[in-house]
Amino acid sequence: MEKITLAPISAVEGTINLPGSKSLSNRALLLAALAKGTTKVTNLLDSDDIRHMLNALKALGVRYQLSDDKTICEIEGLGGAFNIQNNLSLFLGNAGTAMRPLTAALCLKGKTESEIILTGEPRMKERPILHLVDALRQAGADIRYLENEGYPPLAIRNKGIKGGKVKIDGSISSQFLTALLMSTPLAENDTEIEIIGELVSKPYIDITLAMMRDFGVKVENHHYQKFQVKGNQSYISPNKYLVEGDASSASYFLAAGAIKGKVKVTGIGKNSIQGDRLFADVLEKMGAKITWGEDFIQAEYAELNGIDMDMNHIPDAAMTIATTALFANGETVIRNIYNWRVKETDRLTAMATELRKIGAEVEEGEDFIRIQPLPLNQFKHANIETYNDHRMAMCFSLIALSNTPVTILDPKCTAKTFPTFFNEFEKICLKN
């Protein structure tokens, strides 16, 4: 297995231009495909998850041109549902941001009735999709499970989404609601979506609604408890769509600045539509000096203190707080993060296991993690297992800010969202 060892870093300084957001990139591609008109998507992320979406769209008859550096994509919109001529099987890797929205979009009524199979890597077959499928079936969709009930692979017949009253469980993943919201404007009738349980990761729903507005569709949001979507609408191309820099990817660099220097990230700022921009607020609460601009966020070292906080609203960036916590005074508790368990790996168990290898004292709860800080001279050099999870690899790079090296196994797993991460990280590092 490939590995990379990061030597101890004495300080960090510099500016990082962020790659495009994964969440925004895949939403933009799908909305552009369903819209009337041609859309030029710029600052598109070049990563595995985006490639899976692009390959699927091509197989579904969407025509597009991708620039040589793969960051600009011009998409000819279909002006409605996918027009599939033959039965198809689409492989989506471990890309939840492709699997969930495509599951819903492929239920929309095509000119010719076809069956589409959606499948992926072994981990994808362990990632739940029951709540989305249940909701789509209530709206009249034809979906069946091919292996285990509640999990991909799925067989979908594009017979249409009728609409009507639909209940969806919001407690596991906001991507289920995102998928439903993006497809129901093209349903035959109006849809009223009622949320069961506590809706997790609300800022990701805000991203979805903002992007739908950019493509000409409005949704009535009643306090995140009920959503009303008019049927028989059309998405309209905005002609150009700029993908913001990835706020989750910003977290590693901002944390590094807060721990040991000064780092600025560009491509997101105070007006970003991404909830993970609020990661900077958490760092500020811990004591870091944060500066906000229109198109940048800067984090600067100050003594950090532990924090006890519900981080349901920033689940991806919250992982970075878990490794940052080792450098703070006092314990840190990250709460209400059950959905870590249904991500690329069971992130709660993975995080607790790998932090203990470094020497940290950690308590893993069903939906929380409690971390005690570690004196700089007590960090242990460990081989960090990444579980084919890009965020594990990137979070644990921060361990090199101690007096101890860290070895990251399978570093190329960052290709899911940030293939050049380790090169970019090295640019801000001053070695001991």
UniProtKB/Swiss-Prot annotation:
Question: Which Gene Ontology cellular-component terms appear in the entry?
Answer: cytoplasm
Q: Which UniProt keywords are given for this protein, alphabetically ordered?
A: Amino-acid biosynthesis, Aromatic amino acid biosynthesis, Cytoplasm, Transferase
Q: Name one Pfam family in it.
A: EPSP_synthase
Q: What subcellular locations does the record give? A: Cytoplasm
Segments passing through the bilayer = none
The record's catalysed reaction(s) read: 3-phosphoshikimate + phosphoenolpyruvate = 5-O-(1-carboxyvinyl)-3-phosphoshikimate + phosphate
Task: Detail which positions bind phosphoenolpyruvate.
Answer: K22, G96, R127, Q175, R347, R391, K416
Q: Where is the active site?
A: D316
Leader sequence range is none
Which residues are involved in binding 3-phosphoshikimate? K22, S23, R27, S173, S174, Q175, S201, D316, N339, K343
Family annotation (InterPro entries): Enolpyruvate_Tfrase_dom, Enolpyruvate_Tfrase_sf, EPSP_synthase, EPSP_synthase_CS, RNA3'P_cycl/enolpyr_Trfase_a/b
Name any one GO molecular function.
3-phosphoshikimate 1-carboxyvinyltransferase activity
Q: What EC number(s) does its UniProt record assign?
A: 2.5.1.19
Pathway membership of this protein? Metabolic intermediate biosynthesis; chorismate biosynthesis; chorismate from D-erythrose 4-phosphate and phosphoenolpyruvate: step 6/7
What's this protein's function?
Catalyzes the transfer of the enolpyruvyl moiety of phosphoenolpyruvate (PEP) to the 5-hydroxyl of shikimate-3-phosphate (S3P) to produce enolpyruvyl shikimate-3-phosphate and inorganic phosphate.
The text of the family note is:
Belongs to the EPSP synthase family.
Record note on quaternary structure: Monomer.
- NCBIfam families this protein is in? aroA (TIGR01356)
Any idea what this protein is called?
3-phosphoshikimate 1-carboxyvinyltransferase
**What is the organism of origin for this protein?**
Haemophilus influenzae (strain PittGG)
